[in-house]
């Protein structure tokens, strides 16, 4: 836990925090523009050495919006890879398999279509996806037919080239999950896999794209992205 400051100026809400162990300062500015939240983040390396960072937005969806076999997903994803090893007790995808979004190789049986949340009674999975680098914007959209509601994010693939899709469907029995949690993470960032910084740096690249970002000592980097929520029946 780190203390943080919140300030309001006009239509903007700004949060700031300092992380002394990591040697980083962080700022997030949020502005509401019509039906979208525009978010600008700034990370500053206040230490005396360069630092490899795995800057990632951990967007996570759950019930009642999230429903097995019903909630639909779309993304500007291209080349993809399943997590290197079995991801939980109920992982149904082939470890380390490479594929093109959205059809992933299953361990025992047919392929898995990542555009629709699994209908399995229990499941767990993690896949990494390279966003289309030929486009000026990257995105994911989740659609809940029961609510006629679409929700998603838009960002620059040059800022965040990766999307990680994490699935937890009543698989983890330990606390706080207790075998009851249904969640799907749509985690866009500079690193494809949930791994240590040492492993991230050792991986270096995937599909010819860097797996982390290097922040020089005393320097800052910025990124801007949008969160959008709209009513729709398709």
What are the residue ranges of the model-derived segments?
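Extended, loop-rich substrate-binding clefts of extracytoplasmic carbohydrate-active enzymes
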Residues: 1-34, 64-66, 203-204
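Hydrophobic residues positioned within well-ordered beta-strands of beta-sheet architectures
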Residues: 13-15, 26-28, 39, 55-57, ...
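Short, structured patches in soluble enzyme cores that scaffold and shape functional sites
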Residues: 17-19, 28-34, 41-45, 55-59, ...
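Coil-to-beta-strand transition motifs
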Residues: 21-25, 32-39, 48-52, 148, ...
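Short Pro-Gly-centered flexible turn/kink motifs
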Residues: 41, 213-231
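Asparagine-centered strand-capping/turn motif at beta-strand->loop junctions
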Residues: 42-47, 144, 229
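A contiguous, surface-exposed recognition patch within enzymatic or periplasmic domains that forms
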Residues: 49-53, 64-215
């Amino acid at each position: 836990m780190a203390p943080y400051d919140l300030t309001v100026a006009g239509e903007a809400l700004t949060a700031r925090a300092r992380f002394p162990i990591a040697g980083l300062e962080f700022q997030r500015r949020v502005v509401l523009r019509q039906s979208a939240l525009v978010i600008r983040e700034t990370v500053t390396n206040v230490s005396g050495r360069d630092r490899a960072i795995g800057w990632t937005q951990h967007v996570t969806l759950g019930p009642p919006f999230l429903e097995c076999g019903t909630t639909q997903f779309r993304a500007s994803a291209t080349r993809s890879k399943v997590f290197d090893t079995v991801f939980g007790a109920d992982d149904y995808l082939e470890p380390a398999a490479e594929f093109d979004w959205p059809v992933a190789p299953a361990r025992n049986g047919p392929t898995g279509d990542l555009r629709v949340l699994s209908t399995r009674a229990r499941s767990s999975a993690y896949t990494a996806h390279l966003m289309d680098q030929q486009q000026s914007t990257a995105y994911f959209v989740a659609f809940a037919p029961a609510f006629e509601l679409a929700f998603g994010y838009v960002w620059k693939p040059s800022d965040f080239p990766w999307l990680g899709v994490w699935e937890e469907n009543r698989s983890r029995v330990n606390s706080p999950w207790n075998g009851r949690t249904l969640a799907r993470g749509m985690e866009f960032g500079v690193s494809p896999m949930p791994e240590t910084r040492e492993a991230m740096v050792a991986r270096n690249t995937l599909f010819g794209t860097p797996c982390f970002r290097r922040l020089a000592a005393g320097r800052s980097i910025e990124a801007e992205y949008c969160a959008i929520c709209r009513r729709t029946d398709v």
